Each structure stands twice: as C-alpha cells, then as structure tokens.
A protein has these predicted regions:
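Positively charged n-region of N-terminal signal peptides that target proteins for export
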Residues: 1-4
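Bacterial N-terminal signal peptides
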Residues: 7-15
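Terminal, regulation- and interaction-focused segments at domain boundaries
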Residues: 21-62, 120, 142-215
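Compact, glycine-rich, soluble single-domain proteins
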Residues: 30, 71, 81-85, 214-219
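Mid-chain, structured segments of secreted extracytoplasmic proteins
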Residues: 65-108
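Beta-strand/loop substructures that line and gate deep hydrophobic ligand-binding cavities in soluble
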Residues: 95-115, 250-264
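Hydrophobic alpha-helical segments and helix pairs
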Residues: 106-149
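A cross-kingdom marker for long, charged
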Residues: 206, 210-295
Length: 295
C-alpha cells in the first residue's frame, strides 16, 4: 500500500512539474536521409500503430519541399468537443516535413501548447488525459526520430490560456464570422461543395464532421500563389510547417475562423512586429479566401 501511494505521489509530482513548465511550440523530432515520401510513410505508420488516425496530408504552398500530416484520436476528439467554444479546432494535431538539401527535417506541433492555447475554460479537469495524448503522440514518433528539440518559442500555461500577441490584438474568443446558414446541413453542403471545386485555389486537406453535435472542422490548404501560403510562409518561417493547414469551424449554423492576428501569432510567437508588418495583409487575405468557401 505504501509503495502504491509513493508511486502515485511520484506520478502526480511529475505531472505538476510538466504542467508548470513553459511549453515549446514545436519539437524537432529528427532528421532523415530518406525521401520525403518514405519519411511520410514512416510517420503515418508510427502514428497509426499507436492508435492515432491520419485524417489528411498535403504539400503546403504546393511545394515539393514541404509536407504536413494531420492526425487525431478518438479520446482527443471527445475531449475537444466538450469545449463548446470552438474546442474542436484542437482535434487535429500535425507533423511537418521540410526537405533541406539531401535530408528531411521532421517536426511536430507540441500538443500541450495547442491544448493550452485552444481549451480556454475548464482545461484543468482534462489536463491529465490531454497530457497522456501528448505523450503518446511523442512516444509514437520516437520511431521516426529521437531529438525532440524544442523550437519556435515557448509560453507558460497561464499565458497560453489568455494569449494575445500585443495590446489591442485578438484573443482566442474573438473569432471572426464567415457566414451564417439556415442550418448546419446547409453550411456543410456549401463548404464541401466549394472545396470540391477548389474555389479560391484552396484544398480540402481534412474534414472532421460530428453531425450529432452539429460541429465540423475543415483543414484548408491556401494555395493561391499571390496571397496564400507560398506568399506568407517564406516570410514568417517554413520551419513551422506543422502549423498548417488553416481551419474553418462550423458550429450549428455559423461558420467562423480564428483571427489571423491570433492564430498566426500563436503558432509563430517569436515573430517581431517588423516581420508581422511584412504580412500585414495576410490575416485579411486568409479571411477573404475562407469566407469565399462559405458563400
């Protein structure tokens, strides 16, 4: 009995240490000399063998040197749906691949960073379960690489729960409305139809539909060469490729997105104001493109 209590105490203490730490945005999992296709296959297998489900993948900016793999798991989906303020946006986790010369760099978004940034109200009750999902994802990718070097900046749980880039910049709760439909079903039909047509040079990378909850999330590739990913990613940093794709969420009859000035800043928190000014039009361009998918 004493041994059990001691073990539980150690586990609890370890969790408290993790919860109190600053969370990096990304981990560099490792580097491979294999081809992009081969590395992507290894990542897929590693995640699927650990109970995760691959929901979509694509070449951001239509670049052969960039690749994003999106995945989820049933327990994550259930937790995400319990956060009614757009929590389903955190259902999709991402791995990024970037080809540099004769090697491929593998990175992943840190699940706990995303969870703290997106699950605003009531995360404490779900924290242990979310930590397990995060650790399972990292453990799965140990078959791919062993570095797990943090990069991209770091923030504390406290700051992530109320994150905004600067004074007068939006918070998570300041979602931008794209359109309102007569019903959830109509919204689903319109968005799907426009994505099938590739309207606005977009790509339907993944969709998660929870019809019983009247919630759907679409991961959308922004492939317009003038104002899409190929325009802004080279400026703010392609190493953060596990931030893509951008998302639309349909809840009930309303389609919304996270403001670009929030979502971009959250995934690139080390951006200087000078660099942000270089993509000043990007948040509006993204909104216009995604709004077009709802019309």
């Amino acid at each position: 009995m004493k041994r059990l209590i001691l073990t539980l105490s150690i586990v609890l203490l370890a969790q408290l240490v993790i919860f109190s730490q600053n969370q990096p945005v990304y981990f560099q999992v490792g580097t491979s000399s294999e081809s992009m296709e081969s590395v992507a296959g290894t990542v897929r297998s590693a995640l699927e063998n650990s109970g995760f489900r691959i929901i979509g993948e694509y070449n951001p900016a239509n670049s052969d040197s960039l690749y994003a793999i999106c995945y989820t798991r049933k327990d994550l989906e259930e937790i995400a749906l319990s956060f009614t303020d757009r929590g389903a946006l955190a259902s999709a986790l991402k791995v990024g691949l970037k080809k540099e010369y004769n090697s491929v760099k593998i990175s992943m978004i840190n699940p706990m960073y995303l969870f703290y940034g997106y699950f605003i109200d009531g995360i404490d009750k779900k924290e242990s379960a979310l930590l397990k999902i995060s650790e399972d994802a990292k453990s799965a990718l140990k078959d791919v690489g062993s570095e797990f070097k943090p990069f991209g900046g770091e923030l504390s749980k406290e700051k992530l729960q109320k994150y905004h880039y600067k004074v007068m910049m939006p918070y998570f709760k300041d979602a931008e409305e794209l359109n309102e439909f007569d019903s959830f079903e109509e919204g689903l039909k319109v968005i799907r139809g426009n994505l099938e047509k590739g309207k606005g040079n977009t790509k339907n990378v993944y969709e998660l539909v929870y019809a019983d909850k009247k919630v759907a999330v679409f991961g959308v590739g922004l492939l317009n060469v003038e104002d899409g990913e190929s325009q802004f990613l080279p400026i703010i940093g392609e190493d953060h490729i596990a931030a893509m794709p951008y998302e639309i969420i349909l809840q009930g009859n309303e389609a919304t997105i996270l403001p670009g000035r929030f979502r971009i800043a959250l995934h690139w928190p080390e951006l200087t104001m000078g660099t942000f000014m270089k993509i000043m039009s990007t948040p509006g361009d993204i909104k216009n493109t995604l709004q077009g998918l709802t019309e």
